């Protein structure tokens, strides 16, 4: 009751492959991001080596750190949208891309080729909190559980429905996103499920608000030129 925010992240973390220490605790807060992550990143070394070429150093003994740097690099430095971030780190399979409309195929192939070293493999579910909002994402095979619910102007994201019911016993529209399908919540704009937008939900600032932002919609210059 003493704190106010439009978005909250929390995690009861049990580290299995890394030391349990305060530097790797969750929510992992760094570079204006707050990340909670359930899973194991098998592509960690590939992702880490790529990020080190751009000055990011992974020193905190948690694979969540490299996720944070990837988000910062793509969102802040490359000016991708969170939707595009999701299409990089949980990129659709090539066979899935082949079934998309031509323009979308071109964009997804471009992102996969240019940022191939930032594909995150292994089982994971992630909630990324940043200024103005939240993005939740599963690995593309959905090897970790993640559910979403809503009540009035609030959105709840958790590994299990039971956790949502603790916060909001009468939560509605409980939904399990597909693997690789981003769930993005924009403050005062609404909720975005993959390619489905629910404009009835406008997240308001209040003492127990949950929700978020999904960026400014900008494309990096090279992507704008290729995809006007």
Where are these regions (language model features)?
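Conserved short alpha-helical segments that host acidic/polar catalytic motifs at enzyme active sites
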Residues: 1-209, 215, 220-228
